[in-house]
Amino acid sequence: MADNMTTTQIEVGPGATNATINFEAGILECYERLSSQRALDYPGQDRLNRLKRKLESRIKTHNKSEPESKRMSLEERKAIGVKMMKVLLFMNPSAGIEGFEPYCMKNSSNSNCPNCNWTDYPPTPGKCLDDIEEEPENVDDPTEIVLRDMNNKDARQKIKEEVNTQKEGKFRLTIKRDIRNVLSLRVLVNGTFLKHPNGYKSLSTLHRLNAYDQSGRLVAKLVATDDLTVEDEEDGHRILNSLFERFNEGHSKPIRAAETAVGVLSQFGQEHRLSPEEGDN
């Protein structure tokens, strides 16, 4: 087990891979501490969750190639990563920052703050759908599409035609999938299109994507974050088409809203935006 933050020795193991993993684990710890102080915005929270998933996967793979005696958990690597940062930033592992004290849980086992184990920090507050602010729905000339008992090919073609006729600027697109007289899911998309000199239109930003179940309850909500900004012209239509195809797969019974929401969120690595109850449904 890694020692606490006052230890001066850094044991990063052989090779750059161990050093990199440990350093990124230290970055994750910093993100989590900032989050525990409620000082991390939503894009930052997204990056925290992505980094944690990436590290967990990478550590699992890397440990398979290491002897059992050298395998380390994410928490152990966090401790090493934090110590690496202290050396890199201050060139003195015992150096402190004036006016700053590490966060410490005040309990009987950790009453002495300088000697407490830095891994004892509160869990990151959970984010549920209602915690996320969204842009207003006011968009000029919103487009609504109702797909009634269409086969997949016709449904996708109708959506594609509507998307391609959007003007430059912000738009709102509402999609209702009605299969065998069952309104299974309603999807609201807000975004911004750019019109290029050659006449080509691309989606520059996906501001929001909401999915509602049969009772009108919001089951998935995506809002403007760094992850939802389209990086190149082709991405806009690719993202929309992949989402629309997901919604318009043929089903003989109502689509499970929660399952579909998870599918939508996974397009952006945003599964954590579902509350625990919604994720389990």
UniProtKB/Swiss-Prot annotation:
Subcellular location: Host cytoplasm; Host nucleus
Matching InterPro entries: NS1 (IPR004208), uS15_NS1_RNA-bd_sf (IPR009068)
GO MF, any single term: RNA binding
Locus of motif Nuclear localization signal: 50-55
Record has ATP-binding as a keyword: no
Residues covered by region (G1P2-binding): 1-103
Keyword Ion transport: no
UniProt-annotated stretches for the region RNA-binding and homodimerization: 1-93
Assigned keywords, A-Z: Host cytoplasm, Host nucleus, Host-virus interaction, Inhibition of host innate immune response by virus, Inhibition of host interferon signaling pathway by virus, Inhibition of host ISG15 by virus, Inhibition of host PKR by virus, Interferon antiviral system evasion, RNA-binding, Viral immunoevasion
Task performed by this protein: Binds and inhibits the conjugation of the ubiquitin-like G1P2/ISG15 protein to its target proteins. Since G1P2/ISG15 is an early antiviral protein, NS1 may inhibit the host antiviral response. Prevents EIF2AK2/PKR activation, either by binding double strand RNA or by interacting directly with EIF2AK2/PKR. Also binds poly(A) and U6 snRNA.
Subunit (UniProt): Homodimer. Interacts with and inhibits human G1P2 conjugation by UBE1L.
Family under the similarity heading: Belongs to the influenza B viruses NS1 family.
Protein name: Non-structural protein 1
Species name: Influenza B virus (strain B/Ann Arbor/1/1966 [cold-adapted])
